[in-house]
Amino acid sequence: WGNVLFQRCLKSERFREKLDEAILDLKEYLSEERLGTMIEKYKTVVKPYLYEMPDVFYAPLTSEQYDELAASLPEEIEKNYQLYVESLSKPMPFYIGVPVAEGNKMKINWDNSYSFDAEDITYSVEIAKDYLFQDVIYTQDGLLIPETELELPEAGQYFIRVRATNEKGKTQDAFDYYVTDEGKQYGMRCIYVTEDGQIEEDIYEE
């Protein structure tokens, strides 16, 4: 959805219908029974070599874990299909803009979300001093337009989280993320308010 071309395609109902047909056709072909049979055939070829020297020294899984993973693979098709169906009932993700400081105010905006069912979408905004959002300094719910304004916080690090909610009550977070030692924390943007009242965005280069 973050790609402009894909957005244009997915906004077309006819395209989505054809996409559904193609996915269901592939899903029918990749049945659990068929995948299970194919996986067992590959296992008989691959596994004996994987757990012999020197390959076994680098194997990321034990033999038992390998068998468990192989046995679970056929179920992945149905699980992923259900996730795809569920995703179409939610608002689409979006990006949070870089806040702007104007006098003693901070203005925040973000891209519009999108509903495939043409539902009304409202937004909630939270600003916290920590990425776990345990120390929240600002919250606003039920916003109809993608922007909000608040008093410029004191100098420091802040995290912004915006969520979109449609009429069904389904929610969606923003594309943005913050990187910690534990990994990526999705749905938020990190900024810094400087001593002179300027706003700097946190930039992470992968």
Can you say where each PLM-predicted feature lies in the sequence?
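Middle-to-C-terminal accessory/interaction subdomains
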Residues: 1-120, 190, 194-205
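Short strand-edge motifs at loop-to-beta-strand transitions and within beta-strands
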Residues: 146-150
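Extracellular fibronectin type III
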Residues: 167-202
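Residue-level recognition of well-ordered beta-strand positions that form the cores
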Residues: 109-111, 126, 163
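Beta-strand-rich modules
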Residues: 152-171
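Solvent-exposed loop/turn segments flanking beta-strands in beta-repeat/beta-sandwich domains
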Residues: 113-134, 171
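Short beta-strand segments within Ig-like beta-sandwich modules, predominantly Fibronectin type-III
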Residues: 137-144
